[in-house]
Amino acid sequence: PVKSHIRASVPKSEKNNLAGKNVRLSGSSSYLESYAAMIAKKDGHVLPEEAQTESDLSIHITGNVPTFSKLTELSRDEWDKLIDQFINIPATVTQKAISAFVPGGSDDPRKFKDAKGRIVIVGPALPAGKKISGHERAKIEVFRGAMRPFATTVNQELSDVLKSNVRVFLILPGTVDGKEPNDENIMDTINYLMSDESQSSSEVIF
């Protein structure tokens, strides 16, 4: 069965698992360019949005939680936007990617058996800086915390019930000591998640 576990160190794979792979990127526009450059550096191919080509990997970047004083002071509209950004849109992207990896799978679940594909959701980073209050961290953990069971539950279904090799992984950047998230570490993690050994787990990586 798929185990969910959390790790604080960046898993390394000596092999370049992104070489020759077709990658779809979506999400926060401020990150897309740097991710595309890092994927190209590893000889991966970032597919244009309208491309019909089959992908091996779908990466969705949620972007970070915007600045606000208290969750309880948000308007309904502001709250709905956050729910869309961190729950509804990642879920929709995941659903579309799974449909692309397993065409017709929703009508015939047998098609999932042995199908392959990777979906990586990069969630909101913890705040960076030396004097970050617990209150600031807690606001972000509300959304990071909502994403963890989503990835785990989808993986259990894909692995245990449908017997497929399609996996959804969640990366939660940032450190509790307030250091800036490192994009290279995130790319090393994605490279590892493309490896065969990663498919036996549902890793939630800090």
Ranges and model annotations:
Residues S4, A8, N88, T92, ...:
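Short, contiguous clusters of charged residues that form electrostatic/catalytic patches at enzyme active sites
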Residues S164-V166, L170-F206:
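C-terminal helical subdomain
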Residues R24, R118-V120, R167-F169:
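A structural signal for isolated positions on well-ordered beta-strands in alpha/beta enzyme cores
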Residues G44-A51:
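Interaction modules related to DNA damage response and DNA replication/repair
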Residues P1-G44, D56, T67, D80, ...:
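Non-catalytic terminal and boundary segments that flank Rossmann-like NAD(P)-dependent oxidoreductase
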Residues S55-D56, G117:
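Conserved acidic residues
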Residues E14, I61-I89, T94, I98-L162, ...:
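Catalytic loop of short-chain dehydrogenase/reductase
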